[in-house]
Curated annotation (Swiss-Prot):
Name by which UniProt lists this protein: Cytochrome b
Location within or outside the cell: Mitochondrion inner membrane
Pfam family, one: Cytochrome_B
Subunit structure: The cytochrome bc1 complex contains 11 subunits: 3 respiratory subunits (MT-CYB, CYC1 and UQCRFS1), 2 core proteins (UQCRC1 and UQCRC2) and 6 low-molecular weight proteins (UQCRH/QCR6, UQCRB/QCR7, UQCRQ/QCR8, UQCR10/QCR9, UQCR11/QCR10 and a cleavage product of UQCRFS1). This cytochrome bc1 complex then forms a dimer.
Membrane topology value: Multi-pass membrane protein
Broad class of the protein's primary localization: mitochondrion
Reported function: Component of the ubiquinol-cytochrome c reductase complex (complex III or cytochrome b-c1 complex) that is part of the mitochondrial respiratory chain. The b-c1 complex mediates electron transfer from ubiquinol to cytochrome c. Contributes to the generation of a proton gradient across the mitochondrial membrane that is then used for ATP synthesis.
More details: Heme 1 (or BL or b562) is low-potential and absorbs at about 562 nm, and heme 2 (or BH or b566) is high-potential and absorbs at about 566 nm.
PROSITE patterns, A to Z: CYTB_CTER, CYTB_NTER
Residues that hold heme b b566 according to the record: H97, H196
Family: Belongs to the cytochrome b family.
Length: 379
């Protein structure tokens, strides 16, 4: 008799994806973040579901309903902070996951990479809409500023913004639709993540050396399940430390003030994980130019497969490209810092230089490093 996990139509799919999956024997801990992203997504859906049971998407009661969750609902404060800080952990894992793909040349799996970028964009949209829901000062003004950017689109801009708002300003209609989208998008993300996995299993996983590993594969279970459980425990430990000791460290104190359309906060800024893109947006004095730079700062990832000039896939044996990669990481950290600073000297010029360097590295310096390395190896 055949084992049920190999014969049952549904369990068979799970078996081929997580149990008997042939996996390269040399993949490092940088590959752990894919499973951590799955854990983060499930955690966000579950905590979000419990929050939605008590939340009211109405401008008059939204702020009070969040306060009610924290004060009166059993462990409501914990669910709320798990959800808020879970988003931060999600983005940390996501940035590392994308960085790992870039470093080890995983972008040569075109379909997997492109669906990954779509996932990134959907996730950013979901997080932005979630930030609006508590209806604090930063929620309201963040929503106003970011949605207003669409007015830079020639001819249809103003109509588009009013259509998104559902009126002439961010109001009840905006909050209701943002809640609806924030609720449905995680399930779309889940479907996209399954598609992402499906395309990955068509080609098989990449590995640090970047060369085919068909001759040296091991089953995913028990080797990598144990490794993933260790990563998951560390993630949960860090998340619980954040939630139980300093839940507001990554948030903005202005969001504890109820939204007031008549009073603008001194510094409007998004959550920390959007600050790099926000810094690029602010570094261009022209509104349309800033919006284009902001959009292109994420969409540029779609060009990376066609900008790959090296004859080696991974950066493991390419010291020049490694320097460029870590320079890019340092540049993104600089942009994140600048995004949280006020618009004044010297932050303006630092932001502009960091933005120029960001695009130069991806479009010019990294492809150039690949060409130089090829010539050094006489290829």
């Amino acid at each position: 008799m055949t084992n049920i996990r190999k014969s049952h139509p549904l369990i068979k799919i799970i078996n081929h994806s997580f149990i008997d999956l042939p996996t390269p024997s040399n993949i490092s801990s940088w590959w752990n973040f894919s499973s951590l992203l799955g854990i983060c997504l499930i955690l966000q859906i579950l905590t979000g579901l419990f929050l939605a049971m008590h939340y009211t998407p109405d401008t008059t009661t939204a702020f009070s309903s969040v306060a009610h969750i924290c004060r009166d609902v059993n462990y409501g404060w914990m669910i709320r902070y798990l959800h808020a800080n879970g988003a931060s952990m999600f983005f940390i894992c996501l940035f590392i996951h994308v960085g790992r793909g870039l470093y080890y040349g995983s972008h040569t799996f075109l379909e997997t990479w492109n669906i990954g970028i779509i996932l990134l964009l959907t996730l950013m949209a979901t997080a932005f809409m979630g930030y609006v829901l508590p209806w604090g000062q930063m929620s309201f003004w963040g929503a106003t500023v970011i949605t207003n950017l669409l007015s830079a689109i020639p001819y249809i801009g103003t109509n588009l913004v009013e259509w998104i708002w559902g009126g002439f300003s961010v109001d009840k209609a905006t909050l209701t639709r943002f809640f609806a989208f924030h609720f449905i998008l995680p399930f779309i993300i889940l479907a996209l993540a399954i598609t992402h996995l499906l395309f990955l299993h068509e080609t098989g996983s990449n590995n640090p050396s970047g060369i085919p590993s068909n001759t040296d594969k091991i089953p995913f279970h028990p080797y990598y399940t144990i490794k993933d459980i260790l990563g998951a425990l560390l993630l949960i430990m860090v998340l619980l430390t954040l939630v139980l000791f300093s839940p507001d460290i990554l948030g903005d104190p202005d969001n504890y003030i109820p939204a007031n359309p008549l009073s603008t906060p001194p510094h409007i800024k998004p959550e920390w994980y959007f600050l790099f893109a926000y810094a690029i947006l602010r570094s261009i004095p022209n509104k349309l130019g800033g919006v284009l730079a902001l959009t292109f700062s994420i969409l540029i990832l779609l060009l990376i497969p066609s900008l790959h000039t090296s004859k080696q896939r991974s950066m493991m044996f390419r010291p020049l490209s490694q320097c460029m990669f870590w320079l890019l990481v340092a540049d993104l950290l600089t942009l994140t810092w600048i995004g949280g600073q006020p618009v004044e000297h010297p932050f303006i010029i630092i932001g502009q230089l960091a933005s120029i360097l960001y695009f130069s590295l991806i479009l010019v310096l990294m492809p150039l490093a690949g060409i130089i390395e090829n010539s050094l190896l006489k290829w």
